[in-house]
């Protein structure tokens, strides 16, 4: 049995299988998941687990070269945005797109991780980097 790292077997496998430029989405309660895209549903109840808790664990375990966020988070959820940006390494590039475009982009992710987050625009697409 694992003692450290990601203990959820679905999340661990997802992280282990990521290659350079592969993408994963961490989403709030309301983010729709396209047909055919795996959904790893971690939500227990409204707010649990939080977007930030899930993001923290994933950032500890995968190398991220780019993140994609909804432009709307800047005005609708600035506290979430500032906490999120504080966690990113300076080398991570940040792209803002419309929320509608971000939802379209989830059609090309390896999986959507659904959290219990209940604040607006708490969605992010993480693009995997490479360690060599």
Swiss-Prot record:
GO-annotated molecular function: D-ribose pyranase activity; intramolecular lyase activity; monosaccharide binding
Binding site for substrate: 28, 99, 121-123
Enzyme class, spelled out: isomerase
Keyword vocabulary terms for this entry: Carbohydrate metabolism, Cytoplasm, Isomerase
Catalytic activity field: beta-D-ribopyranose = beta-D-ribofuranose
HAMAP family per UniProt: D_rib_pyranase
Family the entry assigns: Belongs to the RbsD / FucU family. RbsD subfamily.
Protein name: D-ribose pyranase
Organism: Streptococcus agalactiae serotype III (strain NEM316)
